[in-house]
């Protein structure tokens, strides 16, 4: 069975764990509708993506 040869320091452990944090989702304001949406995603309110109509617009309030 694998056993560590020496103890890992707190510094080494914490440096390794520094990449384990969760990233927050980023949102941008759509230029045409003013709605918040994820970058590189369809605006679900208008159905537009990069200036083209992809989906039918929704009328949900």
Curated annotation (Swiss-Prot):
It holds the Pfam family Ribosomal_L32p. GO terms for molecular function: structural constituent of ribosome. It comes from Hyphomonas neptunium (strain ATCC 15444). Belongs to the bacterial ribosomal protein bL32 family. This is Large ribosomal subunit protein bL32. GO terms for biological process: translation. The keyword Ribonucleoprotein applies. GO terms for cellular component: large ribosomal subunit. Keywords: Ribonucleoprotein, Ribosomal protein. The keyword Chaperone does not apply.
